Amino acid sequence: MYDAAFYRVGSLSSPDFALNLRYQKSFSGSSIANRSAEEMKRIGVPESQAVLWGKELNTFLPNVEPGQTLTAIYSPKQGTTFYHDGKQIAQLPGAEFSKAFFGIWLDPKTSAPKLRTELLGQSCPPPIFSEAC
């Protein structure tokens, strides 16, 4: 589906981080948004909230082709900023959305625990997840 990479800005305790997804297959923006909402529900986001966020994602997530990237960068002051192949496409404020979105990959209840381990390596998750290490 995609290759994922997780980046931290500064120290391991820094609240700023990024997730980059390089797609191996074609996907419509709506299928990415819908799957994101489903995965949010899986990690405990209430269905009504996940549906709202899925609809919001659907307004800006583009169709992707093999080799293209979607990058999401979190900063507490700005929320989550989305990029498609390096071009900014949206910015969503707020820590709650950010925690739910990045939780798809980084939450302990993710549907992809092996990928979570690969992304985080031996380090702790970002402070937004409030996990003690």
Each model region followed by its residue ranges:
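Terminal leader/tail segments of proteins
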Residues: 1-133
